[in-house]
Amino acid sequence: MNDLPSDAEIARINAEHLISTPLRPADLLFVFGGRYGVDETVAAAVDLWQRRFFRHAIVSGGPTQGIARTECAVIKGGMVKGGVPADLILEEHRATNTGENVLLSLPVIDAALGRQNITSVICLGKICTARRYPMTLHRHWPEVDKMLVTINPFDAPVERWHTDPAFRARVMQEWRKIEPYRVKGFITDWP
């Protein structure tokens, strides 16, 4: 597979995948875990809290690569240190991928808050996965309004993603998942 995208493919990825949405205050911030870009994820969540963009949060992410603390524990710890009240952050400690982030978090959200009480969600995760976060959430929770905030843990700015080998590889890997995941029913079109 050639990882050097054409100009047309770059334009399509920029328009369809590496997106952000206008923000408004939401009932819930859904933080998709990961080990790469933790500091940026925490900073974005704290910034959203300080600007009063969410009332509750859920952090989802399990253990990775033999590290004792889960992604959830690491990210939540950083959010609390940054000033987000611990009791407003729900926890999901088992997920190992985006689909599990959603599937394992929904019962936690339902038990703590009642899904019927949530009308809007901000998805927070890495830019390389971008649109796939709300597409996955939309597949399993279509009723809520979804917004997207992404962090960029790479050395290149987002508009130059295709010039950085690591950034390009991750974007292309995530971009190539969309159609097979759509066919398998893991995600659905959004918006």
Give a label for each model feature.
Residues 158-191:
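A structured, mid-to-C-terminal "fold-capping" secondary-structure block
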Residues 1-171:
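A structural signal for short, hydrophobic/glycine-enriched beta-strand patches
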